A protein has these predicted regions:
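Generic secondary-structure microfeatures
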Residues: 29, 37, 41-44, 73, ...
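Enriched for short, Lys/Arg-rich terminal
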Residues: 1-7, 20, 70-105
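A short, surface-exposed loop/turn module that caps and links secondary-structure elements
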Residues: 42-73
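Arg/Lys-rich, positively charged N-terminal/basic patches that mediate binding to nucleic acids
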Residues: 1-40
Length: 105
């Protein structure tokens, strides 16, 4: 069973607010988000190959086990924030997707 768990992909879900934010994104940003989502599903929450990736410190608006990266640099910069909801059954929740200026960190 241990080997099966290693190859089992992560499940990526969106919080209700992130799902609404996603609907407002320009097409090229949605494509970048889809690419990041695929990487999260295949490789898990740690994504060092994405621009400005880092874990986030828990805070008032930041849950524990949170991470972020930039999916578009320049003006405006677009950011995605996600958290590990369950390591055992491999669930990641994207809780923010939008411009850097409105990011919760």
């Amino acid at each position: 069973m241990g080997e099966i768990d290693k190859i089992k992909p992560w499940r990526v879900v969106y919080s209700s607010s992130a799902a609404k934010q996603k609907k407002k994104l320009p097409g090229p940003i949605v494509a970048q988000l889809a690419s990041l989502t695929w990487d999260l599903e295949q490789h898990g929450p740690v994504q060092p190959d994405w621009s400005h990736y880092s874990p986030l410190r828990k805070g008032r608006d930041i849950p524990a086990n949170a991470h972020h990266c930039h999916i578009k640099s320049g003006r405006p910069t677009y950011v995605v924030c996600w958290q590990v909801v369950d390591k055992t059954i491999k669930i990641i929740e994207i809780f923010y997707v939008g411009t850097h200026e409105n990011a919760p960190y």
